């Protein structure tokens, strides 16, 4: 069954209201994208909980999907009227039904982290049979290895982790770093996340990779310290969790922090230098990683 896809260009003041109104009046879905994406006017936005940052592009486009026989024009008129918009211009096209699973799978290829470390979706053959291959499929939890912060943490584990060390992955998402630590020689690895879906995803991914990783919600994490603590989260949580993460790190143990932007590294380094001797920040595409040894 084909679908009708409608695109409306609007400004940031009404984009969210229009998307909500389209859904209320019968659209199957409504998404907001940067109307200038792919041009020199593309606007990069990084959202972070608790931080005052603009979340909608100044020039946005609302993309709505309708069934083949839905009265899309009537829905658009009703939504526009609700938002106080007159003579709302839009474009439409027909989207043929597809094997969406196969289409999605085709968009995810194996990711090379280093000569010996790859992230490989389950439907792909391992590109390097002798390498460490993390079997990971895109899902609801963050962390497929494509993001610079995940790569930065994986590269640290690949080059710095020592055999037999214990690892805490705080803010584990999909469990990719927890699983990688075990495959790279950790003696034990524990993942923690505030999202129950992430905990379930981590357990499923660990089973797929045949590793004995443990995953917990924060309140369920057993007491104890670790040789290595990794936290690939955002700057604001890192600010608040510093004392706790330091307490979870053994004396002489090491910490790895990412999820922060280049310009946030100096500030975060100042906070964590209370407990750690930090190395210079490593960066990748505007994102940074801090690491160091607990005094």
Swiss-Prot record:
InterPro entries: Ribosomal_L11_MeTrfase_PrmA (IPR050078), Ribosomal_PrmA_MeTrfase (IPR004498), SAM-dependent_MTases_sf (IPR029063). Pfam families: PrmA. The gene is prmA. Its EC number is 2.1.1.-. It comes from Neisseria gonorrhoeae (strain ATCC 700825 / FA 1090). One of its GO terms (biological process) is methylation. It catalyses: L-lysyl-[protein] + 3 S-adenosyl-L-methionine = N(6),N(6),N(6)-trimethyl-L-lysyl-[protein] + 3 S-adenosyl-L-homocysteine + 3 H(+). Methylates ribosomal protein L11. This is Ribosomal protein L11 methyltransferase. Disulfide bonds: none annotated. It is found in: Cytoplasm. NCBIfam families: prmA. Keywords: Cytoplasm, Methyltransferase, S-adenosyl-L-methionine, Transferase. S-adenosyl-L-methionine binds at residues 150, 171, 193, 232. It comes from the Bacteria. One of its GO terms (molecular function) is protein-lysine N-methyltransferase activity. GO terms for cellular component: cytosol. Belongs to the methyltransferase superfamily. PrmA family. HAMAP family: Methyltr_PrmA. The keyword Cytoplasm applies.
């Amino acid at each position: 069954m084909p679908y009708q896809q409608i695109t409306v260009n609007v400004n940031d003041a009404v984009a969210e209201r229009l998307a909500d109104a389209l859904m209320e009046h019968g659209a199957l879905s409504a998404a907001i994208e940067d109307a200038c994406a792919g041009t020199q006017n593309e606007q990069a936005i990084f959202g972070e909980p608790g931080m005052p940052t603009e979340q909608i592009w100044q020039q946005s486009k609302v993309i709505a999907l309708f069934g083949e026989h839905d009265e899309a024009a009537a829905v658009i008129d009703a939504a526009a009227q609700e938002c106080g918009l007159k003579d709302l211009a839009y474009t439409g096209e027909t989207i043929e039904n597809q094997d969406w699973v196969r289409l999605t799978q085709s968009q995810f290829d194996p990711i090379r982290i280093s000569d010996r470390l790859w992230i490989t979706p389950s439907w792909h053959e391992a590109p390097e049979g002798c390498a460490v291959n993390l079997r990971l499929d895109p899902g609801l939890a963050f962390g497929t290895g494509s993001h610079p912060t995940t790569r930065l943490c994986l590269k640290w584990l690949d080059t710095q982790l020592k055999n037999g060390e214990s690892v805490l992955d705080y803010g584990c998402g999909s469990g990719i770093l927890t699983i990688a630590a075990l495959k790279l020689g950790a003696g034990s690895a524990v993942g923690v996340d505030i999202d129950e879906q992430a905990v379930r995803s981590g357990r499923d991914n660990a089973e797929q990779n045949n590793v004995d990783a443990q995953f917990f919600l924060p309140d369920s994490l057993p007491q104890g310290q670790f040789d290595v603590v990794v936290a690939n989260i955002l700057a604001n949580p890192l600010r608040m969790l510093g004392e706790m993460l330091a307490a979870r790190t053994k004396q002489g143990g090491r910490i790895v922090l990412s999820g922060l932007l280049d310009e946030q590294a100096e500030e975060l380094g100042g906070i964590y230098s209370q407990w750690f001797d930090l190395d210079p920040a490593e960066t990748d595409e505007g994102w940074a990683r801090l690491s160091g040894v607990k005094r």
